């Protein structure tokens, strides 16, 4: 969750990147926004009559690739730098082969990356960035809704579909035959399935954008408050506008959906950049433009495979202009029109009436315009964990960062090849061994009673309700006596010791270390994992009078 503002002007932009069991939404990388003492974007709420509508992915604010894949996500960035509040998560498709001793097989082709930012303009004004990449499959759907209210678009030549629903012009609302044919199933509470939402969106209009476009909601009963979504780039995706309501009957709402649809040869790549603003009266933003086309070989150069780095210019009504850059490859120096050079994960260069006022660089080494700006020696700090005090949740890392006290109150990342976790630092100090960082949360994430052993396996009959979602992939299993510790590849009928890290973990050795009847602990991290945090810099430039 990203937070900004004070008092009645507090705002929060959040993203769901975890997984849970039971009564849940299909909401991987779904986002929400709260501002002006109101919920602006969010879930559709509790299911009406136990209907599948509220939990279906189409009714969230996210994207899906088809064929559908099971995904889990990890936090990649959290940072506050001057007017910028930034977060990013990466979702990856996977196959669960833990029970056969093969661990989780993570897909290189099927993934999603979503970067969010709140950018402050004043005490009560702000805008948000949503930078979204989808890879995999041969068809992508990006789905978005706000609230009820008068709706208008700019930059779209919408063509009305002749009847039907999003499922097709010949498919009536809630058509049973279509749902059955497309893999949905019927239960006591009605139909459900991945494509359930398609025959429940109607009044379909379509457009192929030729440039920047926007959608504006005059929110109902909101004292003149507008929500505007501006999309400077859609990677040639089709835009679809529909109406939607709860199919459970007596729906309390009817409102607009905006979707984007892209098809191609697998693995398809879609990159969407969008800017969100709230305003009363006149819009906060005058215009948004991409820095050239945003395809895989855009002017900012290639980034991760199939995608180009982001470059946007946001012109505000108050005379301020923000030039924004983002990439996953923080080491490549990129040039952009206007004399810009950028190497980093995120950068913002603000000018007021043509004069530089603020420069922000996150996870990078350079953001300059004609030589003016920020340069640093390295994009991030990275060091191995050399000691863990589990009683106090304190890790020691060496070599120590230049100023470990500056980490207090900020998030660091604990990583290994299978795991990346965000932890807030509560205390920091240094000694001869390195930097000691006390972390906020209990690192114990599971416990099980030992029931037996196998080679590379500590067996347990204890149920782990969150297994299967990669929560334990790359975690540590620790004996009751705390004399033995191993990195594991997952849990399925016990903890599987990772053979790539521990070549020798025979059953007899594990039986000695983990006696039957004792309880082992599963911990988030251990010695040998790395602690990482992006370097963050924000410079305010004094204005000459």
Residues of each region from the PLM?
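Non-catalytic terminal regions with compositionally biased, polar/charged low complexity
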Residues: 261-271, 277-545
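Short amphipathic beta-strand/extended segments with alternating polar/hydrophobic composition
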Residues: 11-18, 40-45, 113-115, 143-145, ...
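Short, hydrophobic/aromatic-enriched beta-strand segments in well-ordered soluble domains
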Residues: 144-146, 225-234, 238-246, 270-281
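Polysaccharide-binding surfaces and accessory modules of carbohydrate-active proteins
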Residues: 147-228
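Catalytic and substrate-binding regions of extracellular carbohydrate-active enzymes
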Residues: 1-174, 187, 266-271, 275-281, ...
């Amino acid at each position: 969750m990203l937070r900004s503002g004070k008092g009645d002007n507090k705002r929060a932009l959040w993203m769901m990147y975890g997984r849970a069991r039971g009564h849940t939404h299909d909401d991987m990388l779904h986002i929400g926004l709260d501002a002006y003492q109101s919920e602006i974007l969010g879930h559709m709420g509790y299911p009406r009559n136990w209907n599948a509508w509220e939990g279906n992915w189409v009714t969230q604010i996210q994207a899906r690739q088809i064929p559908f894949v099971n995904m889990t996500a990890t936090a990649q960035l959290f940072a506050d730098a001057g007017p910028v509040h930034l977060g990013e998560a990466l979702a990856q498709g996977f196959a669960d082969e833990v029970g056969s001793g093969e661990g989780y097989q993570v897909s290189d082709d099927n993934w999603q990356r979503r970067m969010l930012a709140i950018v402050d303009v004043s005490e009560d004004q702000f805008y948000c960035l949503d930078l979204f990449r989808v890879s995999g499959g041969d068809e992508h759907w990006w789905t978005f809704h706000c609230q009820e209210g008068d709706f208008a678009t700019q930059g779209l030549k919408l063509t009305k579909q002749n009847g039907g629903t999003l499922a097709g012009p010949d498919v009536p609302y809630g058509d049973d035959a279509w749902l059955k044919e497309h893999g949905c199933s019927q239960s006591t509470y009605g139909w459900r399935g991945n494509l359930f939402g398609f025959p429940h969106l109607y009044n379909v209009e379509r457009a192929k954008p030729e440039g920047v476009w926007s959608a504006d909601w005059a929110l109902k009963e909101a004292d003149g408050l507008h929500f505007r979504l501006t999309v400077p780039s859609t990677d040639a995706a089709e835009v679809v506008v529909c109406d939607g309501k709860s199919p459970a009957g007596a729906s309390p709402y009817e409102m607009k959906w905006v979707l984007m649809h892209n098809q191609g040869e697998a693995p398809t790549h879609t990159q969407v950049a969008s800017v969100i603003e709230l305003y009363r009266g006149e819009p906060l933003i005058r215009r948004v433009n991409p820095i050239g086309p945003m395809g895989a070989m855009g002017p900012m150069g290639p980034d991760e495979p199939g995608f180009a780095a982001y470059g946007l210019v946001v012109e505000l009504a108050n005379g301020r202009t923000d030039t924004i850059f983002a990439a996953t490859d923080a080491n490549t120096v990129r040039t952009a029109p206007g004399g810009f050079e950028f190497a980093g994960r995120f950068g913002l260069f603000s000018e007021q009436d043509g004069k530089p006022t603020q420069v922000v660089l996150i996870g990078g080494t350079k953001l300059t315009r004609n030589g003016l700006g920020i340069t640093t020696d390295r994009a991030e700090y990275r060091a191995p964990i050399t000691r863990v005090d589990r009683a106090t949740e304190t890790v020691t890392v060496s070599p120590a960062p230049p100023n470990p006290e500056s980490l207090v109150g900020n998030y660091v990342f604990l990583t290994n090849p299978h795991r990346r976790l965000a932890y807030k630092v509560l205390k920091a100090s240094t000694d001869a061994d390195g930097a000691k960082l006390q972390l906020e949360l209990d690192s114990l994430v599971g416990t099980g009673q030992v029931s037996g052993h196998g080679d590379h396996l500590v067996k347990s009959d204890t149920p782990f309700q969150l297994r299967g979602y990669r929560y334990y992939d790359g975690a540590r299993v620790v004996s009751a006596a705390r004399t033995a510790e191993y990195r594991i590849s997952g849990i399925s009928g016990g903890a599987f010791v990772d053979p790539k890290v521990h070549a020798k973990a025979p059953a007899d050795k594990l039986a000695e270390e983990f006696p039957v009847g004792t309880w082992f602990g599963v911990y988030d991290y251990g010695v040998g994992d790395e602690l990482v945090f992006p370097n963050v810099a924000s410079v305010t430039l004094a204005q000459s009078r």
